[in-house]
Amino acid sequence: MIRRIEIVRAHINLVSPFRTSFATEVDRNLLYVRVVGDDEEGWGECVAMAAPLYSSEYVDGCEEVMKRYLIPMISASTTAEEFVQKSAAIRGNFMAKAAIEAALLDYQLRKANMSLANFLGATQTKVASGVSVGIQPTIDDLLRVVAEYRADGYVRIKLKIEPGLDIDRVRAVREAFGPDMLLQVDANAAYTVDDAAHLAKLDEFNLLLIEQPLPEEDIVGHVELSKRVGTPICLDESITSYDVARGALDINACSIINIKPGRVGGYLESKRIHDLCLSRGVPVWCGGMLETGIGRAANLALAALPGFTLPGDTSASKRYFTQDVTTPFEIVDGYIDVPNTVGIGVRPITEVLGAMTSRVDSYSITK
């Protein structure tokens, strides 16, 4: 039986600044959910940023929603599936919901002696690892960083782009590393449909995809863009649920989907989107939100499902952190092993997380 829910707040620095079209991150304000029962526990990680720049959610807001609305929904016997049904009454707040769902899943699967990978239906024991490269100060810096990641064994490179820092940089990387390297770009909604002719210039570089070129709300605009750009369009920020994913596919707004559990409300909804795409022959891949090992472990389990045919952003721990809160994930010959023990397969290292933690709030479950 569940006895209490803990909200753990902590802080971790990134090994280097990570710049996108909308922000530069140098650290992460962490929010973990810990479900504590009589003889077991479960952990979930909230992926929201400190400010509402990627989406409308932000980490302090997620904590408030958890405390005021989501945790009071949980009883001693609530399962992840039941929580998803109950929390549907609260609009949006997908990242807050996803963190609690993940902790409940970890808890109940540990009690059932089952791994998250097996629960979701994973068919792979390791997943191909790609890496996301932030916008660099110069092209020379970009080439140096890409070379380092290639040396580390990453099988796919993703370049963050924005207007004015796109075509020349992609050309430089393609020329430096050859036509066979798996390469894609991510705009994080930095362009408009009026930029279609400009984005079409990317077609010559044989990219896997262009990720989220237009604003989140402009799904219809992506339909028009898909007609004018030869490179496959992948949606990220726009896809916030199964229903949105189905609608986007129905109108041909994209031909690839990036599934991020935090963005869609959790791993159960992520699996529904995966199953939809698999049934339609639409490739998916697992995106990243600079997760520590707790979130990364769960993402690896998801990325091991059969429809995840493109390398995701499930990079090694050292890509982002000098010291992760869990035993670090390592890349070996381009792949990262999927945790195969119970639950998400990892737990935080008590001493490490303790040194990073600023506050732990505990909420008793009495009903």
Annotate each predicted stretch with a short phrase.
Residues 117-229:
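Metal-dependent enolase-superfamily TIM-barrel catalytic cores that perform enediolate-based chemistry
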Residues 1-41, 47-54, 320-322, 363:
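Structured beta-strand/loop patches that form or line metal/cofactor-binding pockets in enzymes
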Residues 5, 322-367:
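C-terminal extensions of enzymes
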Residues 1-9, 110, 114-126, 329, ...:
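N-terminal amphipathic alpha-helix/helix-capping segment at the start of soluble metabolic enzymes
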Residues 46, 131-133, 159-161, 185-189, ...:
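A cross-domain feature marking catalytic cores of carbohydrate-active enzymes
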Residues 4, 35-36, 41-111:
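Metal- or metallocofactor-binding catalytic centers and their adjacent structured scaffolds
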Residues 217-234, 239-335, 339:
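Shared catalytic-loop signature of beta/alpha-barrel
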Residues 33, 39, 100, 113, ...:
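Conserved, mostly hydrophobic/aromatic
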